[in-house]
Amino acid sequence: MKVRQAVVMVGGKGTRLMPLTETKPKPILSVVDKPCIWYLIRSLARAGIEEVILACGYKPGMMEERCDGSDLGIRIRYAYEDEPMGTAGAMKLLEDQLDDTFVASNGDVFADIDVAEEIGVHQDTDAKITIALTPVDNPCEFGIARVDASGRISEFKEKPKPEEVFSNLINAGVYVLQKEVLSRVPPNQFFDFSKDLVPIILSEGGRVQGYSLSGIWMDVGRPYDLLGANLAMAKREHIRDHRAEDACIRGDFYMGPGSKVANSELISSVVLAGSKVENSRLERALVMRNCKVDGARIINSILGDGCIVKHGAEVLNAVLADNTVVESGQRIDEGRRV
C-alpha cells in the first residue's frame, strides 16, 4: 500500500543554535542556499509522499514563507501548537487527519536520505514503528537502540549516561508509523515519541523495527554542525562555481547566486547568495546571505545574514548574529557568539 503522508515536527526554538535562530526558525537556516528542511522534504517527495504536514511552533510565518513545496511537487499543510506538546503529542493533535501508515520526522536534522527504503522495511516486517538508525561516536545526546539479527529493536534508551550506553546506533528522528500507536498517547498532554511512546510499544510486545539509514544525515544542533552540513552538500552535489576572481580556492567550496569572491583565499568555505568577499582569507567559514567581507580573516566561524566585516578585522571561532557589524581592526574570537 502506498504511503502518501508525512508529519514533520518543526516547533522547537533551536536554542543551541543561537544567535542564528534569534531571527528565524532552525529548519529554514540555509544549507547551500536551500532551507535545511528542504532536503528532508525532497527525500520525502522522492519516496512518493504527496502531502507533508509541518507541525509548527516557533515563528510559523517564516516557515510558511520559505517552505511551500511548489518546487518539489509536494503539498504542504501547516498545523500550529498553542503550547509545546512534544513529538508524540504533536502527532496526537493530528490523529484524525492521518492515514493508517505515515512517515514522521523531526525537522531539526539535516537529512538527504532514502525514505522509500525505510518505508519498504516497515511494510516488509509488519512493524508498528520503524526508526531510522545511524552510528555515531558519542551517543549520549541521543536515543540509542539495541537490535537483533533481523533489525528488530529489543531495547531503547533516551540520552543515556556514559555508563548506560549499550549501542552506538542512535535514533535519527525519521520514522514510519502505524496510526494505531497514537492510541497510546494521552490527549492534551506533553508526550515525547522516543522517551514515552516507544518504550510503551516495546513493553506491549509491538514490533519496533530498526532501519539502517542510507544517505547523508546530520544533527544540526549547534552552529558548527550547520557549517558541516553546508560543506557536506557542497561535496556531495559537486557544487563548484568559477566566478571567483583571482582567488585561491582549496577544499569543498560553494558560491551562491549573486555572490562575489575576489582577491581572496578560501579553504573549505561556503559563501551564500548575495554575499561579497574581497581581499580576505576564509577557512572553514560559512558566510550566510548578503554579507560583506573586505580585507578580513574569517576562521572556523559563521556569519549570519547581512553581516559586515571591515578591513583588518578578524573573526576566529565565533558565530555572529544577523546584521552584525565588525569594525576595522576589531577581533572577535574564542568561541564567542555575538
Give the location of each predicted region.
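Conserved N-terminal catalytic core of the sugar/cofactor nucleotidyltransferase
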Residues: 1-8, 30-117, 321, 329-338
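Glycine-rich hexapeptide-repeat left-handed beta-helix
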Residues: 96, 277-338
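Catalytic-core segments of class I nucleotidyltransferases/pyrophosphorylases
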Residues: 102-103, 110, 119-123, 137-139, ...
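A short, conserved acidic/glycine-rich loop-to-beta-strand motif
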Residues: 125-135
